[in-house]
Amino acid sequence: MDRSEIVARENPVITQRVTNLLRTNAPLLFMPIDIHEVRYGAYMLFMYGSLENGYKAEVRIENIPVFFDVQIESDNTNQLFLKSLLAAENITYERLETLTQRPVMGYREKEKEFAPYIRIFFKSLYERRKAITYLNNMGYNTAADDTTCYYRMVSRELKLPLTTWIQLQHYSYEPRGLVHRFSVTPEDLVSYQDDGPTDHSIVMAYDIETYSPVKGTVPDPNQANDVVFMICMRIFWIHSTEPLASTCITMAPCKKSPEWTTIVCSSEKNLLLSFAEQFSRWAPDICTGFNDSRYDWPFIVEKSMQHGILEEVFNKMSLFWPQKLDTILKCYYVKEKRVKISAEKSIISSFLHTPGCLPIDVRNMCMQLYPKAEKTSLKAFLENCGLDSKVDLPYHLMWKYYETRDSEKMADVAYYCIIDAQRCQDLLVRHNVIPDRREVGILSYTSLYDCIYYAGGHKVCNMLIAYAIHDEYGRIACSTIARGKREHGKYPGAFVIDPVKGLEQDKPTTGLDFASLYPSLIMAYNFSPEKFVASRDEANSLMAKGESLHYVSFHFNNRLVEGWFVRHNNVPDKMGLYPKVLIDLLNKRTALKQELKKLGEKKECIHESHPGFKELQFRHAMVDAKQKALKIFMNTFYGEAGNNLSPFFLLPLAGGVTSSGQYNLKLVYNFVINKGYGIKYGDTDSLYITCPDSLYTEVTDAYLNSQKTTKHYEQLCHEKVLLSMKAMSTLCAEVNEYLRQDNGTSYLRMAYEEVLFPVCFTGKKKYYGIAHVNTPNFNTKELFIRGIDIIKQGQTKLTKTIGTRIMEESMKLRRPEDHRPPLIEIVKTVLKDAVVNMKQWNFEDFIQTDAWRPDKDNKAVQIFMSRMHARREQLKKHGAAATSQFAEPEPGERFSYVIVEKQVQFDIQGHRTDTTRKGDKMEYVSEAKAKNLPIDILFYINNYVLGLCARFINENEEFQPPGNVSNKDEYAQRRAKSYLQKFVQSIHPKDKSVIKQGIVHRQCYKYVHQEIKKKIGIFADLYKEFFNNTTNPIESFIQSTQFMIHYFDEEQKVNHSMKKMVEQHAALAGNPAGNPAGNPAGNPAGNPAGNPAGNPAGNPAGNPAGNPAGNPAGNPAGNPASNALMRAIFTQLITEEKKIVQALYNKGDEIHDLLTYIINNINYKIATFQTKQMLTFELSSTHVELLLKLNKTWLILVGIRVAKKHLHALLGLHNNEPPSKTFIQQAIEEECGSIKPSCYDFIS
């Protein structure tokens, strides 16, 4: 079923009426959704949307004039001069027109108010842009000079909003397939002023399912074997969540369902073509998915490219004329569109923008609505809205069903996919996304695409120009090109009165706020660029003529900036552009809020089953969307005025607004103080005020004369709040009258919002209390909290719970006669309970969130992601089936984690070696839960809770800094946190055990080292040097001793080879008795026990060093053959040593297991405070055998190395007589003495 058939089925009556109107060429209503321009050749504008009944329509606007304006002052006002300028650059134009307009920058007196401009008309945008660039470079001021999107200028000039109903008149009509094509001129388009009928534009929500044969990975469109195997689509009316039709396109057999049409394709290529075909049949106005701009669209486009069908797919989906592949990729595939989520965050989107259909990513919309959301999944946003959740189907099961081609199970996959698409529309409707954006577009004369993909400042700028260029606002000529030097610096700061920190339990505090301070200042002081006077001489001249001026001055980048603005004195004709626009917006919003209130009251009186309820609900949503749009513009107005990239930017205006805010808050401050009121705190646009004590004298005396029960005290507090409310109402009226007298207008006003009692101020912009708005409300369930970190994004439930407990406990009403614990006592009590009673906390209390931003230097997150990458790679090496649990989130996406406890580790000398870095302790929530990893509660307390707790108590006298400290708050906060850290250390049992464990470790090390030194002499020093230079004993020990680990089977062969070489050497040297045959290495025959280990290598006992027995010192070698043999022996020793090293390396795993076993036992015995007993272990026979062989091999290697030294000495002395003992025996005896090291001694 195609779109026309669906429309006829759903709206038969309206369809018949629209058909009749088309036959008679009568005026029709058209709702634009998407805009496309033909920028080459003659300019044309195409608008795509729907007619009243839902028919798809294309409106082509022809004969649109292409022009811009240029201001030419002094004698060069004639057209001939401009013609000569254009001719010099070979710029072709159609005609010139002279007109007068008011320049937007700088005040002009009435007789000089208008300046001459020349409007230049062109045949194409190319020539227009060329002329704008040339004249700007020449220094001329231009206006109506949009260079990116000309349709915005068309909309402004014609006063024709692009997001609401338009009436088509005098059109030419041509039906072509599903699309009703109209051709009109600008004069044939009329803005429809009423709300219009129900919009029947069509939204297509879709979702894709992908597959990869590599389990545990996210399918990648660049991988040939990764495929999209299913696409599900569902269409709706734009305002409804009831589906009109549904389709499932799949590559696997799928059981049919009455809820959707199933299309089975034989290949991925056919699936993509079927998707394009179905898209063209429905011709949706809006296409939406969840995160589709970051996954679905890039996947579809990339796969279409691989199959060579992107051109065909695009042209099927597009309502425009066919395009070539290079044009599609250049103009219609938006690869990197930066979408602003909040002031600090943007996200990159990619999508295929086919003419006639506007793509909307629901995830982006929800992130803009919830910029501080910790989870940004579809499931999370559905939960936030109270909507039905998505279907739960794990990916590994989905892929299994696809692999098995089970049609029953594939129906489950299709249902999962269809429901995901359904939930996208549910979210769009619930949040009123399209109507809200449309209202913004109506005000700003921008398209729906602009309202979705561009930031607020862009729309405010366009709205200002739309107001400015029309007669009722003075025909102000505005440029869209920012000019002048762009300076970066800070405007005057706000006026701040430091808070009186601490808990206030005796007197109510009332907040007095300016209503919309910056817009109010703009309206009051006539801040507008065309009302600005730059020079003092001109200002004096104007004042001499009776004009009233507002002077502004402030310091910016080390210089004085000053200026004057001509005041309006409440005369409408004197009001500037900015105040006029703001007043108009304010009046509109006030009227809408009044209407909204009435509609809300009606909604409460009508049941949902009433026939008129839906219409009432729709009307309520529309009015609410309009007032929200007005609020957005008013709130972002100053932001654009202070944006130095804006064409409206004026430094004296931007700084003048903030300095005027500072002035007025000081004015109110002094007025209130002189009235006898106290100030608890003040900042930017608000003051927190306490009434004079005399106000409460009567009620206080009544309490003191009562029985002073709890009930009497509650009554006293109740009456104090009522008295404060009454006094503040009077004070507020007096303040507003005082402001009116000072600035001469009623635009700048203050209002009191709430009375806080009790209340606690902990720092600038940080306070909490019980709020009383209309009546006293001591039984409230929610505290009034501002700036306290428990509501900070990413914060754990642990921190929120502890912070809430402290605040709730401190807000309890306590009589002066009772014990009123100071805040520090409350904090310590709550903190002690949190630390000592650990069992009260659940796993969920420790879950945190953070954002993954690869370009930001968030060290903890960077370390964590590096660990996860290494873990994924390790799993892949071992052929693990899944690594998705360690997957890296998308840039900008938030992820959940916990801080887990790492085993306390010490080096062999008792120094802690376990990491304290946060990034090394972070684990994904799923991983920590699956492995039941212990939470590092102390880390949370020290790093997240204590800072919050310190904020409550840092006003205490003991934490205050000396007088020469500049940042007193920071100093006090640091001291308070240090105090609480010591408090936690005193009550946390684990900290004590860790300290004791380190002491025991150091004692054990000292004892072990002494024992080893007794037994192996020189080896103890080598052992000590090794462990002093390592932070990981097991791994480093293995690396340093890999040459000691195998070659046991070859031991006898090595000994035999060495003995044979020595015998040959002795025979040639004429000393056959030098090496008793059969003497095994490692057991020197005839060597008495206790032979000193200090005997120099190569010097037989009793022989002078360097002088072999029987050979005079320095006697040259008398036998060249013997000399050569010694070299051969030396070479053989090196060869044998290399063989041992290589062979022993292969036994690494066995020795690793052994060392791990021993080290773990050491740690266990240290943890249980066993000292000398730790030297005894119960080892298996395998371990014992390995230790014995390791011991022997060590000795062999030592022998070889010492033998090399002997040979080197012999060669150096040209001595051909060998020592009296074998080299190996001599080495062992000299290096180890008569006491051979035991197995455990050696390993330790």
Swiss-Prot record:
PROSITE patterns: DNA_POLYMERASE_B. GO terms for biological process: DNA-templated DNA replication; viral DNA genome replication. Its EC number is 2.7.7.7. Sequence repeats lie at residues 1069-1072, 1073-1076, 1077-1080, 1081-1084, 1085-1088, 1089-1092, 1093-1096, 1097-1100, 1101-1104, 1105-1108, 1109-1112, 1113-1116, 1117-1120. Changing residue 512 to F: In strain: Isolate PAAR-463; phosphonoacetate-resistant. GO terms for molecular function: DNA binding; DNA-directed DNA polymerase activity; nucleotide binding. Coiled coil: none annotated. Changing residue 515 to V: In strain: Isolate PAAR-20; phosphonoacetate-resistant. Induction: Expressed in the early phase of the viral replicative cycle. Residues 1069-1120 are annotated as: 13 X 4 AA tandem repeats of A-G-N-P. Keywords: DNA replication, DNA-binding, DNA-directed DNA polymerase, Early protein, Nucleotidyltransferase, Repeat, Transferase, Viral DNA replication. It catalyses: DNA(n) + a 2'-deoxyribonucleoside 5'-triphosphate = DNA(n+1) + diphosphate. Residues 1069-1118 are annotated as: Disordered. DNA-directed DNA polymerase involved in viral DNA replication. Belongs to the DNA polymerase type-B family. This is DNA polymerase beta. The lineage of its organism: Viruses, Varidnaviria, Bamfordvirae, Nucleocytoviricota, Pokkesviricetes. The gene is DPOL.
